[in-house]
Design a protein with these regions (language model features):
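Short, solvent-exposed turn/loop segments enriched in Gly/Ser/Thr/Pro and often Arg
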Residues: 18-23, 80-84, 135, 243-246
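Active-site-adjacent "subsite" loops/lids of carbohydrate-active enzymes
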Residues: 15-66, 200-202, 222-230
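Aromatic- and glycine-enriched glycan-recognition loops and surfaces
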Residues: 1-10, 26-31, 42, 52-59, ...
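Glycine-rich tight-turn/loop motif centered on a GG-T
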Residues: 1, 42-51, 91-106, 171-181
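Aromatic- and acidic-residue-enriched segments that line the glycan-binding/catalytic groove
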Residues: 1, 22-44, 88-100, 145-153, ...
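Substrate-binding groove of N-acetylhexosamine-processing glycoside hydrolases
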Residues: 69, 102-334
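Active-site groove signature of glycoside hydrolases
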Residues: 20, 45, 60-102, 297, ...
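An active-site-proximal structural segment forming one wall of the substrate-binding cleft
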Residues: 2-16, 48-81, 111-119, 232-235, ...
């Protein structure tokens, strides 16, 4: 409650990221026939909570209702229902569940989101329930979206599945990128599905930094940021989520993106900001530098192993060897 109140002083609402119902270890279910009836598919030593069991969905709704009843002023939630964490049976190995294996995958994902929406809005009708399609199989998106409550907002990452070729290497993006043209055909398609289903739409973006270069507070590629903003205006999305696990620094990137209203071209907007921030003489030089940075960044050698395992996040602390070691780099952030 204190965090909600502090944020409210500045006109900010707090949202919760929900990755529920979270799987539990065997010890949670052992010795309790009732709890064991909630268990679904198994991954390692974790059992999912089976969303084909009505009691699990009712518990999920009650939990959301209780949370939003006790924390007045929460802005809402956004959900991940098919992530790398084991949650419902549909998040992993649902074919191993005796109940879920008989049902459509799209029904299972929609059920969890419906249960969350029901509980949130019973306690707080004005709170937003944003449903993110992270991890949904591409051929299931339309069916899931069509089953979501009309009160939900649908969110997808703007650049996902954008196809590019850098240095002769073809890549289909499954990560955030500031070096590519966005939104992708997949994002446009899923937003259109959502509009047809009567849902509001959200673009999930990172305009400050990505794993392409996470060591800096922001990447000075403002031409690319402005171009992305222009493209999203053309898509007429209802909202944006501006950062995620990195990229929250209050930079000129964020200032440019948030203020972009389409009344001037991308080039004009970047130039105007440079002159406002640095004056006429220095602003012209800054503008040219940003143009060159943006141009160069479009040649970034984007590949998932580069951005996750490359040495560029570590900088001078990265060790050098005179001979090959055959060591495999640890994933960034671990």
């Amino acid at each position: 409650n204190r965090l909600v109140e502090r944020a409210a002083k500045y006109g900010i609402k707090r949202y919760l990221y929900l990755n529920e119902p979270r799987a539990m270890g065997e010890e949670y279910f052992d010795g309790s026939p009732q709890r064991m009836s909630y268990a679904g598919s198994k991954l390692g030593d974790l059992y999912s909570f089976c969303s084909s069991n009505p009691e699990v969905l009712a518990w999920l709704s009650r939990s959301m209702e209780g949370l939003f009843s006790k924390v007045d002023g929460l802005g809402g939630v956004f959900t991940i229902t098919a992530s790398e964490n084991h949650t419902s049976c549909a998040s992993r190995n649902y074919r191993d569940c005796s109940l879920c294996s008989k049902r459509e995958y799209s029904d299972l994902i929609a059920d969890v989101n419906r249960a969350i929406e029901l509980g949130v809005h019973r306690a707080s009708p004005d709170a937003k329930v944003i449903v993110w399609d992270w991890g949904w199989p591409d051929d299931k998106c339309e069916k899931i979206i069509n089953q979501l409550p009309k009160e939900c907002w649908f969110m997808t990452v703007s650049e996902w599945m954008q196809r590019i070729e850098r240095g002769g290497v073809p890549v289909s993006l499954w990560e955030y990128s500031m070096s590519v043209e966005a939104p992708s055909a997949r994002a446009k398609r899923n937003w259109e599905y959502a509009r047809r289903a009567g849902l509001k739409t959200v673009a999930k973006v990172q305009v400050n930094a990505t794993w392409e270069m996470a060591i800096v507070p922001s990447i000075p590629v403002l031409d690319l940021v402005a171009r992305h903003a222009t493209n999203l205006l053309e898509q007429d999305v209802d909202g944006v989520m501006l950062s995620w696990s990195l990229g929250g620094y209050p930079s000129e990137n964020l200032k440019l993106f948030q203020s972009f209203d389409g009344k001037m071209s991308a080039d004009e907007a970047v130039e105007k900001l440079a002159r406002e921030e640095y004056g006429e003489k220095a602003g012209a030089l800054v503008r040219e530098a940003r143009r060159e940075c943006s141009k160069g960044f479009e040649a970034y050698p984007f590949h998932i192993f580069v951005i996750y395992n490359g040495p560029h996040h570590i900088g001078p602390s990265n060790l050098f060897y005179m001979t090959p070691t055959n060591y495999k780099a640890t994933m960034v952030g671990i």
